[in-house]
């Protein structure tokens, strides 16, 4: 029961403060990875585009 309650609180908190999820800062030790972390959400789109390029290369068989 406490797990469900804590999960509910976490979800409710993320709804109240959605910008804190997107603009969270990395710890100081990992600051060098900031540019990589900024690009990471876009990586799945590259695979999606790669599928179209691949299909175009094989003439959409």
Curated annotation (Swiss-Prot):
**Cellular location(s):** Plastid, Chloroplast thylakoid membrane
The record's annotation in Pfam families points to: PsbK
Family per record: Belongs to the PsbK family.
**Membrane topology type:** Single-pass membrane protein
Species this protein is from = Hordeum vulgare (Barley)
Q: Keywords assigned by UniProt?
A: Chloroplast, Membrane, Photosynthesis, Photosystem II, Plastid, Reaction center, Thylakoid, Transmembrane, Transmembrane helix
InterPro entries, A to Z: PSII_PsbK, PSII_PsbK_sf
Which residues fall in a coiled-coil region? none
Q: Which GO terms describe its cellular component?
A: chloroplast thylakoid membrane; photosystem II reaction center
Protein function: One of the components of the core complex of photosystem II (PSII). PSII is a light-driven water:plastoquinone oxidoreductase that uses light energy to abstract electrons from H(2)O, generating O(2) and a proton gradient subsequently used for ATP formation. It consists of a core antenna complex that captures photons, and an electron transfer chain that converts photonic excitation into a charge separation.
Q: Which GO terms describe its biological process?
A: photosynthesis
Q: Which residues form the propeptide?
A: 1-24
Q: What is the protein's given name? A: Photosystem II reaction center protein K
Self-association and partners: PSII is composed of 1 copy each of membrane proteins PsbA, PsbB, PsbC, PsbD, PsbE, PsbF, PsbH, PsbI, PsbJ, PsbK, PsbL, PsbM, PsbT, PsbX, PsbY, PsbZ, Psb30/Ycf12, at least 3 peripheral proteins of the oxygen-evolving complex and a large number of cofactors. It forms dimeric complexes. Detected in both etioplasts and green leaves; PSII is only assembled in green leaves.
For this protein, the parts annotated as crossing the membrane are 32-52
